[in-house]
Amino acid sequence: GTRGLSRAADYLSKQFTLSGVPPLQANGGYFRDYPLVQYQWANSTIASDKNLFNMMTDFYGYAGANNSFSYTANDIVFLGYGIDDTLYSDYKNVDVKGKIVLIASGEPMVNGKSVITGSDSLSAWSKDWRKKAAAATSNGVMCLLTIDPKLAEILNNPQWKNFLEGSLIKRQSEYKQPEYTNNLFISQNMADKLL
């Protein structure tokens, strides 16, 4: 734990002793080990030949949905919307295995109708980032970059900012590797500079 947590535990232990509460553990103490894993991204950056992009300014990602990573890539593949559906696939005849892939959010529309649903209702490909992340994972993508048109709005929202900058703590026994390839959400400006 942190220094503050240790001090709080010491204080509680002393208060229990002063109050006459008998120790609960076989070792004569009041506390048991409770191993935790903390996910937190701090000062994350992405560098290109001419630019340095910063977490919470140019991009964001979900700490629990990504592994710690460091990549070097000669190029980034732009792959439309990153959809891999029987009705529409950006992955068809494209080798993206081991590559960094950049995609647009949303889905293709023709005359105000989704190519996938055939109506003005959007498909699951537009509603849940995990669907595109799963497609990227199954196609061997090394890292998925999604252009988020709402990035500035999200990063200027105090609740979102606190959530994205904060840490995620889980019991060590519940820890599991993220099920998707690493994925980040980037600004249009960052996308323009990367391509």
Mark where each language-model region is.
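Short secondary-structure transition/capping segments
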Residues: 49, 66-75, 148-155, 190-195
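BRCT (BRCA1 C-terminal) domain core and associated BRCT-interaction motifs
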Residues: 34-43, 152-162, 187
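Noncatalytic luminal/extracellular "stalk/propeptide" segments of secretory-pathway proteins
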Residues: 1-113
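A conserved hydrophobic secondary-structure block that centers on an alpha-helix together
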Residues: 75-160
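Hydrophobic alpha-helical scaffolding
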Residues: 2, 122, 180-184
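Long, well-ordered, tryptophan-enriched scaffold segments
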Residues: 138, 142-152, 163, 169-195
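Structured catalytic/translocation cores of nucleotide/phosphate-coupled proteins
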Residues: 1, 128, 175-179
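Extracytoplasmic/secreted proteins, especially bacterial periplasmic and envelope-associated proteins
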Residues: 3-18, 29, 128-135, 140, ...
